[in-house]
Amino acid sequence: MAEAVQPSGESQGAELTIQIQQPAERALRTPAKRGTQSVLRVSQLLLRAIAGHQHLTLDALKKELGNAGYEVRREISSHHEGKSTRLEKGTLLRVSGSDAAGYFRVWKISKPREKAGQSRLTLGSHSSGKTVLKSPRPLRPRSRRKAAKKAREVWRRKARALKARSRRVRTRSTSGARSRTRSRASSRATSRATSRARSRARSRAQSSARSSARSSAKSSAKSSTRSSAKSWARSKARSRARSRAKDLVRSKAREQAQAREQARARAREQAHARARTQDWVRAKAQEFVSAKEQQYVRAKEQERAKAREQVRIGARDEARIKAKDYNRVRPTKEDTSPRPAEEKSSNSKLREEKGQEPERPVKQTIQKPALDNAPSIQGKACTKSFTKSGQPGDTESP
């Protein structure tokens, strides 16, 4: 079978798919060489048509095959299905497409044979219709033709007789050979059957003995394996139960240890938190006390500084007054000139001021909260030193 496909070919607006196939009956009846040559020729023509035409159509394909001396006819019967039994000539083409689908038979147009006693010129003259002179060669008489026919018939009869004799000889030789081969085959078959029966009996006996031994061995092995399997299963179950119990005990102990560790960690965290809070409270209290002490010390220092300044101012004033009084009481010899009135007024003012006593610093006491004993003692010492230094008799030199 040969195929030739033209994907772009169109026959009345449809694509062509061409397939060449040869019926099986003709392939069996006719010689193979002749059929293959015809199929090859048709396939070559199809390939040439496909290569020569860009868009191959069914009409163009018919023209190409007609020019090559082939005739194309649509196949209507169901030969491709294998139902027809008559002998058909030519090759079968299967064309698939929308409008050109179907089977087509292609065969070579046979040339007219030349009759005996006629030349090609006479045939050409008859076909063309022109009157041409006959050949000078005379025709054979009818008697010769009859003699030739009889000779052919005799020859055919002799050939048939020879064929029949050869067939009879062949059948006799084949029948003798067949009888001999049959006897030999029967003897061989009987010997083979007896040997097979003996071998089968022996094999059956051996197989029965082996099966009995195997069954006994299997039964004993099964019983032993069952008992061993049961004991093994029991030991396995016991070991598994023990391992499970041990695992449970270990897991419980681990859980208890973890719980204890967690409780200890919580207690430690709580103790650390309490210690931190206590330290924070103590630090806050110490900061408060230190701040109070600093405020108290600063206030004391400020009071002392103020008292010292007042004492210095008073001592200076007293020294000035004394100096003035001393200068007034003891005048110098050189200074015998009368003093002006302004000096007299100033001296009178000084006397009046002298008559008035200077203000003494008042001892101030500040109540301090009883926080610690050390700062209170220091405060008392400071007050004592202040009172001693603040006496009117303690004067600094100007």
UniProtKB/Swiss-Prot annotation:
Biased amino acid composition, Basic residues: 137-149, 157-171, 233-243
Region (Disordered): 115-398
Keyword Cell cycle attributed: no
Keyword Ligase among UniProt keywords: no
Compositional bias of kind Polar residues: 119-130, 384-398
Any GO molecular function: ATP binding
Described function: Essential for normal spermatogenesis and male fertility. Required for proper cell restructuring and DNA condensation during the elongation phase of spermiogenesis. Involved in the histone-protamine transition of sperm chromatin and the subsequent production of functional sperm. Binds both double-stranded and single-stranded DNA, ATP and protamine-1.
UniProt name for this protein: Testis-specific H1 histone
Organism encoding this protein: Mus musculus (Mouse)
Gene: H1-7
